[in-house]
Structures are given as structure tokens and as C-alpha cells.
């Protein structure tokens, strides 16, 4: 299990086989979260979703956008839909900014307006509002990871997982006709780049590596790898 987790880029510096055998809950949960997070965020990039070019801000370059980690791209996507809905609020985190359910209500009504209305905004009881929101998420096949209580508590991990699942299921971004090409590799070169990316992440370098060539440009990640 440890070697398999390491092979997909999880940091395993603080957990060993004995910890799993002994049932050390906090270490096991930490490893499970890394595995889930990687699976959810793996395809949130320009290569898999070239329509993400719509999220570029004024003056931002293609190279700048490539440097964004997937969680920041998700926040950008969330805010894109809030803006499109002419909503007055924006999100900068997966905790307090989503805990009252207002922004989720707008996001869902924007990505699937035929099945998700804004009725939860009329509910003043926040726990009941959270349940209404998740009922609408269920209607579009996205009631996963989050509970009313964890939404209200502003659990950042579960909220991130929920938003990632929404994006992976309903990105709701119009395709672009003239998106700049993302650098392609032959199959062998792409496999090698992926192997190096996973290996670096298994060393627990900070920040994590998502775009190998962009993230290595300043040399910081390489210096960290030498010290491991």
C-alpha cells in the first residue's frame, strides 16, 4: 500500500507499513485523503479541459495560468460562475466562504439551472439550507463527500472534494474555437514526465508539482529534492 501510494505521488514520509497494521487512524486518514485528492484533481488542467482558458484574467498569460495548482483553478472556476450569475460575493477558500451555503446555491443554479434553483437562499436555518443544497446536488448526481454538518463547519478538505466533483461532472464552460495549444509530448515522453512529477511529490516538496516544466523553472523544487 505504501509503495503504491508513493508511486502515485503521495507523500509517505510520516507513515509506514507498521502504522497501517497498528491502525493509526490519523496517519491512515491522512494517506487516504492524499489518494482521494490526487484522483479528484488529476484532470483539472488545460490539457484535459482547454475551455479553462475562459478563466484567464485580464493581462494573465498562458504560462501564468499553467502555474496555478488545481485547487486555485477550482476557486477561479467557482468565481467565474458567480460572476456570470451577477452575484455580489466571491470565494477565496473552501471553508468560511462556502459555509453558509449562499455561494453553493448560486454555483449550482448557474451550472445546472434546470434542476437547481435558488430556493435555499430563502431558508434562514443554515443546517436546513445545507441539506437543501445537497438535495439539489443529488439531483445532478453530485451528492458526494459533503454533509450538511461539514458544510456548515467549513471543512476545507470535504468542500474541496465536493467542488472538484462538481467541476469534473459539470464544468459548464463553453469550448473555445481558438485556444492556444498546450504543449504535447509523445507517449513515452509524457510517461516520463508523469513519473518524475509523481516522484517529486512523493518527496513531499512544497508546493506540490502539477506542471513539471513550469514548476521547476525557479529551481526551488529541485533544491528541495536534493535535500531529501
Region roles according to the model:
Residues 1-228:
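Alpha-helical coiled-coil scaffolding segments
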Amino acid at each position: 500500500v505504501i509503495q503504491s501510494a508513493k508511486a502515485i505521488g503521495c507523500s509517505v514520509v510520516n507513515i509506514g507499513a507498521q502504522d497501517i497494521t497498528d491502525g493509526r487512524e490519523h496517519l491512515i486518514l491522512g494517506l487516504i485523503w492524499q489518494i482521494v485528492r490526487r484522483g479528484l484533481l488529476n484532470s483539472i488542467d488545460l490539457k484535459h479541459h482547454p475551455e479553462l482558458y475562459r478563466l484567464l484574467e485580464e493581462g494573465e498569460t498562458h504560462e501564468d495560468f499553467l502555474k496555478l495548482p488545481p485547487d486555485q483553478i477550482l476557486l477561479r472556476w467557482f468565481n467565474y460562475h458567480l460572476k456570470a450569475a451577477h452575484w455580489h460575493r466571491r470565494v477565496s477558500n473552501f471553508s468560511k466562504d462556502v459555509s453558509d451555503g449562499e455561494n453553493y446555491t448560486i454555483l449550482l443554479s448557474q451550472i445546472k439551472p434546470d434542476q437547481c434553483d435558488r430556493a435555499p437562499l430563502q431558508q434562514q436555518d443554515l443546517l436546513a439550507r445545507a441539506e437543501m443544497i445537497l438535495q439539489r446536488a443529488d439531483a445532478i448526481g453530485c451528492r458526494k463527500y459533503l454533509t450538511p454538518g461539514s458544510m456548515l463547519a467549513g471543512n476545507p478538505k470535504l468542500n474541496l472534494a465536493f467542488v472538484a466533483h462538481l467541476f469534473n461532472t459539470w464544468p459548464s464552460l463553453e469550448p473555445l474555437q481558438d485556444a492556444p495549444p498546450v504543449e504535447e509530448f509523445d507517449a513515452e515522453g509524457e510517461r516520463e514526465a508523469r513519473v518524475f512529477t509523481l516522484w517529486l511529490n512523493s518527496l513531499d516538496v512544497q508546493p506540490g508539482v502539477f506542471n513539471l516544466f513550469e514548476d521547476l523553472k525557479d529551481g526551488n523544487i529541485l533544491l528541495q529534492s536534493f535535500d531529501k
